[in-house]
Amino acid sequence: MAKLDKNQLIESLKEMTIMEIDEIIKAVEEAFGVSATPVVAAGAVGGTQEAASEVTVKVTGYTDNAKLAVLKLYREIAGVGLMEAKTAVEKLPCVVKQDIKPEEAEELKKRFVEVGATVEIK
């Protein structure tokens, strides 16, 4: 197997999606028995906020011609039937997924924005 240098590895990572990079991180953690979770220094109280570990993705709007595409994508991601998806998309804002990782939320937001939706992550 050809050995990659640091720059080649970084260039390869630039071409990947967040989800692919997350899978690589998990594989490295497992292979080497380490964790990529940052260590919080003892005594560091207040002053800084921790990044949200779980977030909620909401569709807050969509362009005039994007309703059908948003409905189809909502249905696919939320795993609901046509009528439930139609009701949710017509009564905005609607929660797509909740208690998910920020990386997954960004990926979902990207997919919805591509079809013409406005998305909020909280």
From Swiss-Prot:
Keyword Ribosomal protein part of the UniProt annotation: yes
One Gene Ontology MF term: mRNA binding
An annotated GO BP: translation
Keyword Ribonucleoprotein assigned: yes
Keywords: Ribonucleoprotein, Ribosomal protein
One annotated Gene Ontology cellular component of this protein: cytosolic large ribosomal subunit
Subunit structure: Homodimer. Part of the ribosomal stalk of the 50S ribosomal subunit. Forms a multimeric L10(L12)X complex, where L10 forms an elongated spine to which 2 to 4 L12 dimers bind in a sequential fashion. Binds GTP-bound translation factors.
Family as reported in the entry's similarity comment: Belongs to the bacterial ribosomal protein bL12 family.
PANTHER family attached to this UniProt entry: 39S RIBOSOMAL PROTEIN L12, LARGE RIBOSOMAL SUBUNIT PROTEIN BL12M
Main function: Forms part of the ribosomal stalk which helps the ribosome interact with GTP-bound translation factors. Is thus essential for accurate translation.
Protein name: Large ribosomal subunit protein bL12
Species this chain originates from: Mycoplasma pneumoniae (strain ATCC 29342 / M129 / Subtype 1) (Mycoplasmoides pneumoniae)
